[in-house]
Structures are given as structure tokens and as C-alpha cells.
Amino acid sequence: MPKVGMQPIRRQQLIEATLTAIDQVGMGDASIALIARLAGVSNGIISHYFKDKNGLIAATMRYLMNALIDNVHERRLALTDDSPRAHLQVIIEGNFDASQVNGPAMKTWLAFWATSMHHPSLHRLQRINDQRLYSNLCCQFRRVLPLPHARKAARGLAALIDGLWLRGALSGDAFDTAQAQRIAYEYMDFQLAKQVS
């Protein structure tokens, strides 16, 4: 009989083991057996909680996405300035938060992006994540720019955030958060300077 209250603990253990496994050997070689061994559980526990490896990968991605959402939300709650610039800054900061730019998270995101092109459920998660970023950026740009310009600025900043993140992930060096934020802020300020009086 399973212990009461163990499900959230086990699920988190398995998600953390998945991040570690992908960091160590990549998504393709991150087998159920390896993940279970890293988590200190039997292979059957993964099937019990997640059905299969794809279910575990989807849960791991939801975990990373929720960490991103939570980071942005916490930063927004701490804002004393309600300007579009301040809100855009916290979105940028959240996307370059340590929870998103550490080695295991970056390797998992990269593997997820590649895999999502071939798995409909993962592709759906990627589209949700992409749309959320675009929508949040557009909402803030829309406060000061006409809609067509706000959409274009949001698309550009989303692409820049993803591009900076991707370049950092592939560089092999520690992610330079300050530099990435500085570049994104410059683009943001350039777009905000176009505001209609």
C-alpha cells in the first residue's frame, strides 16, 4: 500500500532525476531505468505516475514552464513601478532566471524543442509556452504602441529572448545573464521609444 502524501514527493523526485539524466546523457539516452536509478525508485514507479517516458518528459517541461511563470509572477508582485518598461523587464529577467539558465534546465529545454517537432503533446506545450511569452510582451507594448507595432515589437523581443538564450545554451560557457538582459533591454527601450504621444 502506498504511503499517503508520497505522490507529490515521488513526482518531484522523478522530475529532478529526469533533469539530471538529460544533463548527463541527453534525452535520447535518458532511459526509464537510468531515471529510476537516479531517483532511487523502481522502473514501475515511472509508469505508475507518468505512464511512460513521454509523460515524464511532458511533466518535466511543465515543471520548467511553471518555474518560469512563478519567477515572472513573483517579480511582478515586487514591482513598485507599473510602467510597461518595468513589466517588460520582469518578463526578460524571468526568462533569464537561474532556474531557466542552469545546465540541466538548458539541456532539457534544447532537447524538448527538438523533440516537440515530432510529438504532438510536446508540440502543444511548446506552442503554449511560445504564445504565453508573446502575449505577455504584446500586452505591455500595447500600452504605449499601436497594435500592429506592439505585435511586431513583441515578436521581435520574443525572438531575441529565445535567440540569446539559445546562443548562451550552445556556447559551452556559463550563461552570461547580465549581458543577455542588457541586450534585451536595449531592444525593449528602442521599441518603447517609438511610443505615440
From Swiss-Prot:
One of its GO terms (molecular function) is DNA-binding transcription factor activity. GO terms for biological process: glycine betaine biosynthetic process from choline; negative regulation of DNA-templated transcription. Disulfide bonds: none annotated. InterPro entries: BetI_C (IPR039538), DNA-bd_HTH_TetR-type_CS (IPR023772), Homeodomain-like_sf (IPR009057), HTH-type_TetR-like_transc_reg (IPR050109), HTH_TetR (IPR001647), Tet_transcr_reg_TetR-rel_C_sf (IPR036271), Tscrpt_rep_BetI (IPR017757). Pathway: Amine and polyamine biosynthesis; betaine biosynthesis via choline pathway [regulation]. Keywords: DNA-binding, Repressor, Transcription, Transcription regulation. It comes from the Bacteria. Residues 31-50 bind DNA. It holds the Pfam family TetR_C_6. Residues 8-68 form the HTH tetR-type domain. Repressor involved in the biosynthesis of the osmoprotectant glycine betaine. It represses transcription of the choline transporter BetT and the genes of BetAB involved in the synthesis of glycine betaine. This is HTH-type transcriptional regulator BetI. It comes from Pseudomonas fluorescens (strain SBW25). The gene is betI.
